[in-house]
Every structure is written in C-alpha cells, then in structure tokens.
From Swiss-Prot:
Lineage top rank: taxon: Bacteria
Family, as annotated: Belongs to the DnaJ family.
This protein's name: Chaperone protein DnaJ
Keywords assigned: Chaperone, Cytoplasm, DNA replication, Metal-binding, Repeat, Stress response, Zinc, Zinc-finger
Length: 373
C-alpha cells in the first residue's frame, strides 16, 4: 500500500471538515468497492488506500498525530518508526501505530469493531399516478445473507468461535512502556473478543455470502421526486450476528405526458378552438382520477388559468390536497376547407370597425398611433 498523503487519497483539503471527509470517503468507497469491481486488483488496492485514509482522518486523535508526524506516526515493525520514538516499534509483534492514537485514552472499555451491516442505497422510478395515490413496489437489491452453512457464526459446522487467547475476550490488549500504560485493539481477533480457529469453508469465516434480496417498499401517497424512504434493518446484514444496516430508497417520478407537478398542484395545457374561446362552452378535461367537466367562459383568451379544485396531489404530511390548473391555449385552425375560409373572410369583413370586440388589438393600434404622431 502506498504512502500517498491521506488528504490527497480522499481528495480533500487539510482543513476539510469531518462531514467533507466522510462525504469524500463514501463516494470513493462506493466507486472502488470490490463488489463493484470484481477481479480488479487496482480497484481493490485503491479501496484499501481509501479505507486506511478514512480510518485515520475520521479519528480526531489519529488525525492530530498524522497532521504532526505524517505516516511516521503509524509505522510499526522493527524499522524504528515515529522518528525519535524508534524504541516503541515492533515490541512483542504488536503494531504500535494504533497505540499512539490511544496512548492517553485511559479507561478499560472494550474496543469492539463496528460489524453492523452496511447501509444500502437504491433508486426506484414510479409514475405520477403512483406518487399521487401511493403504491407498493417489490425491488431486488444485491446484498449479503447469513451463511447457510455456519448460520452466520463464521465457524465450521460442529465448531464454534472460541474466546480469543490473546485478549481473553476483552477485545483489547494493554502494553506497559515506561510510565505509560497503553491500550490497543487486539491484533488477533481485531476487537471481536473471539477467535475462529476452524473457519467455515463456504464463507471463509466471514459469516455471510453474496445474495439478492427482494424487499417490498410501501411508497406513501404524496411523495415527491427525490425523496428517500428508509427501511430499517433491510440493508446489508451484520457480521457474526451484529445488526443489519438500513435500506434507503430514493424515489424518482417519471415525466408525465400531460401534467407537470408543482408541489401539491398539477398544471396542464388545455387547447380549445377559437369558436369556444369566443362563445364559451363545456368540455372534458383529464385528471389523475379520470375526466371531469369544465365550463369555459365566453371571450376566454390564451393564457387564462382555470382551476379544478381538489384534483392535485394529496399532501404527504397532512390532509391537504392540491389543485389542477388548466392553462388555456386558443388554437388557430389549420388545413382549412374552402367553405371555412369563406366563412372566416366573411367574419373578417363584418368585423371591420368593431374594434371594441378586439380590445388588445385596439390597444396596440392606439399605441402605434401615439408612437408615430
């Protein structure tokens, strides 16, 4: 593993906040995760480097040591790492790199590693109708499941995990150096307190195997595009009996052919003939619940907005329901017949001098006269 600067490994500045470091780690860990890059040694090495960098920079004490001494703060073995503290390296086969981060930790609490299952994030696409009314969806997600051979224990059938002989089950070991009594995670069991002497052949002692799981997601009425649903305990299973992680489902709403959503309200264009626009009339308009009748007043102009109350989307958090807004578009007819042309020409002739019937046109002409007078 290279000794590249940990901040450079995560792509963050030295002054980066904890949240920035965590965000960068999650992005890179997802990118280089072995499950996403099978048989890719380069990605596997990158993943290890990212994990090592995050392990150091996410811990305040380790980060402080690294900022002061760099990689030398964590070099173990017989190389005399940590600059002038060469006498601390390699004693009794322990990695004293971790000890320095715990030198003044005190306490005798058990340093258990976090074996809880990973959180899993997936996306799902639904229709606007499903978002408005709510729907149940079944999705398949890649995950791990407890090994069916060892029942998740990690031990060979007939055997069982034994108390770690190094730490006697505490998960930590203590080292006495001069006046310092230092504590570190047990190098044998890695803090678990137990040691698997005969690992399961199928899972190789991990206690879980790759699988595909089907989960039913209850999507509530009123959900909006981009919102997430959390399913507790439906993420990756924990190791050696630890609790599972959570499943986060991000909902995406497919674009609708007619409606556009704005919060709880729906909007659509409603084309009408110029005859209906002038004379008024009644027509059917679509909603998410079927068709309803809408009365168009006479002398309706393009751009007029007509409301159909209660035909929007139900609120996710209250009993409120939005409205449907129909935006009128007066459509100019095309492909006219000779008879239609004659009637329109006749209409134009008999309309001459009746400027009050076209107030916008009259206003425009008046402005033109004022402009050039």
């Amino acid at each position: 593993m290279s000794n590249q600067d940990f901040y450079a490994t995560l792509g963050v500045a030295r002054a980066a906040t904890d949240d920035e470091i965590k965000k960068a780690y999650r992005k890179l860990a997802m990118k280089y995760h072995p499950d996403r890059n099978p048989d890719n040694k380069e990605a596997e090495e990158k993943f290890k480097e990212v994990q090592k960098a995050y392990e150091t920079l996410s811990d305040k004490e380790k980060r402080a040591m690294y900022d002061q001494y760099g990689h030398a703060a964590f070099e173990g073995g017989g190389q005399g790492g940590f600059g002038g503290f060469g006498g601390f390296g390699g004693a009794q086969g322990f990695d004293f790199g971790d000890i320095f981060s715990q030198m003044f930790g005190g306490g005798s609490g058990r340093a258990q590693p976090d074996y809880q299952g990973e959180d899993v994030q997936v996306g799902i696409e639904i229709t606007l109708e499903e978002a408005a009314k709510g729907v149940k969806k079944r999705i398949n997600i890649p995950t791990y499941e407890a090994c069916d051979v060892c029942n998740g224990s990690g031990a060979k059938p007939g055997a069982s995990p034994e108390t770690c002989p190094t730490c006697k089950g505490s998960g930590t070991v203590h080292i006495q150096q001069a006046i310092f009594r230092m504590q570190q995670t047990c190098p044998t069991c890695r803090g678990a307190g137990k040691h698997i002497k005969e690992p399961c052949v199928k899972c190789r002692g991990v206690g879980r195997n790759k699988a595909v799981k089907t989960v039913e997601v209850n999507i509530p009425a009123g959900i909006d595009d981009g919102q997430r649903i959390r399913l507790s305990g439906e993420g990756g299973p924990g190791m050696h009996g630890a609790p599972a992680g959570d499943l986060y489902v991000t909902v995406r709403i497919r674009a609708h052919k007619i409606f556009q959503r704005d919060g709880l309200d729906l909007h659509c264009e409603l084309p009408i003939s110029f005859a209906m626009a002038a004379l008024g009339g009644e027509l059917e308009v679509p909603t998410l619940d079927g068709k309803v009748k809408l009365t168009v007043p006479k002398e309706t102009q393009t751009g007029r907005r007509m409301r159909v109350k209660g035909k929007g989307v139900k609120s996710l958090r209250s009993s409120a329901t939005g409205d449907l807004y129909c935006h009128i578009v007066v459509e100019t007819p095309v492909n006219l017949t000779d008879r239609q042309k004659e009637l329109l020409e006749e209409f134009e002739r008999i309309s001459t001098g009746l400027e009050n019937q076209t107030p916008r046109k009259k206003s425009f002409l008046d402005k033109l006269r004022d402009l050039f007078d």
